[in-house]
UniProtKB/Swiss-Prot annotation:
Stretches assigned to coiled coil: none
Record protein name field: S-adenosylmethionine:tRNA ribosyltransferase-isomerase
EC number, UniProt record: 2.4.99.17
Catalytic reactions on record: 7-aminomethyl-7-carbaguanosine(34) in tRNA + S-adenosyl-L-methionine = epoxyqueuosine(34) in tRNA + adenine + L-methionine + 2 H(+)
Keywords: Cytoplasm, Queuosine biosynthesis, S-adenosyl-L-methionine, Transferase
GO molecular function annotation: S-adenosylmethionine:tRNA ribosyltransferase-isomerase activity
Designated gene of the protein: queA
Organism the protein comes from: Streptococcus pyogenes serotype M5 (strain Manfredo)
Length: 342
């Protein structure tokens, strides 16, 4: 299959720049790929798509305020670092701008020197490995100095940083939010649980690769980014019990899907506690092993995420649903509306 097979027309005004006032007031397009049906709804009605005994699986990663602005003490030149992943101890892989000024041994100061970074290795495409030095607790220093790394297609300033976190965000480590979860409120989750649905949490730390365009025509040549995931024994046991009792595993977002399917692939369809790195690329032809249904936002044309949804529901039907969403003025991408896929 070709990358262009997943292209569609998207007017720029449909790219949501700000979150809605109420998280669960977004629109929800409910699609059933077997019946070939589409129903326009609202997100708080997602509870009607869930049955007692189902498991709703959510990614509890928390977005780090990973964008840092500093200066080189020798030249006072301005530098921007974007934290990508913690490699070990106080060492991080970062994206640096302007990278050409930052050679091994270069120093950058942030916040009057409260946080210092030393370049210890150079990677391609502006990547660097840095070692941080600071007083106190790193995450607290980062919270006070860093900014939320919003996606490149969002140009408005975010008034409340918590709106780019899910209400259940807990495990620090992402460079981007698992946006399908942004629609849930604490109240809605309580109602879902009261219906007899099991709430299950896993962790996948979302990397910036999630925004990286597919640069090859032939999908088989695409090099998928790696992300760290973790599923606890308690969560795995709940999911096994749900499957055994005939319930469905309903994933919230593509990050939950990728975690569950990575584990399903590793353990021949069984669900086991596990952690590690995944670069799973789910595209048409893939056989799903764990996930029975899911919610997700509307994704970028030609992205690996549109390909994932197409693997589950069929490319032609998914693109038809996307055309419907465009016609009905659904809001797209991170702060946009959602789709529920049966």
């Amino acid at each position: 299959m070709n990358t262009n097979d997943f292209d569609f027309e998207l007017p720029e005004e449909l790219i949501a720049q700000t979150p809605l006032e109420k998280r669960d007031s977004s629109k929800l397009l409910i699609i059933d790929h077997r019946q070939k049906t589409m129903v326009d709804s609202h997100f708080d009605h997602i509870i009607d798509q869930l049955n007692p005994g189902d498991a709703l699986v959510m990614n509890n990663t928390r977005v780090l305020p990973a964008r840092l602005y500093g200066e080189k003490p020798d030249t006072h030149g301005h530098v921007e670092l974007l934290l990508l992943k913690n490699t070990q101890g106080d060492q991080w892989e970062v994206l640096a701008k302007p990278a050409k000024r930052l050679k091994v041994g270069s120093q950058v100061n942030f916040g009057d020197g409260r946080l210092k970074a030393t370049i210890i290795d150079e990677l391609e495409h502006g990547g660097r490995i840095v070692e941080f030095s600071y007083d106190g607790i790193f995450l607290e220093v980062l919270e006070s100095l860093g900014e939320m790394p919003l996606p490149p297609y969002i140009h408005e300033k975010l008034e409340d940083a918590e709106r780019y976190q899910t209400v259940y965000a807990k495990e620090n480590g992402s460079a981007a939010a698992p946006t399908a979860g942004l629609h849930f409120t604490t109240d809605l989750l309580k109602k879902i649980e009261a219906k007899g649905v099991h709430l299950v949490y896993l962790t996948l730390h979302v990397g910036l690769g999630t925004f990286r365009p597919v640069s090859v025509d032939n999908l088989d040549e695409h090099d998928m980014h790696s992300e760290f995931y973790s599923l606890s024994e308690e969560a795995a046991q709940t999911l096994r019990d749900v499957k055994q009792a005939g319930g469905r595993v309903v994933a919230v977002g593509t990050t939950s899907i990728r975690t569950l399917e990575t584990i399903g692939g590793k353990f021949q369809g069984d669900i086991q506690a596990d952690s590690g790195w995944t670069n799973i690329f789910i595209k048409p032809g893939y056989q799903f092993k764990v996930v029975d249904a899911f919610s997700t936002n509307f994704h970028l044309p030609k992205s690996t995420l549109v390909m994932l949804v197409s693997a589950f529901a069929g490319r032609d039907f998914v693109l038809e649903a996307y055309r419907h969403a465009v016609d009905e003025k659904y809001r797209f991408f991170s702060f946009g509306d959602a789709m529920f896929v049966n």
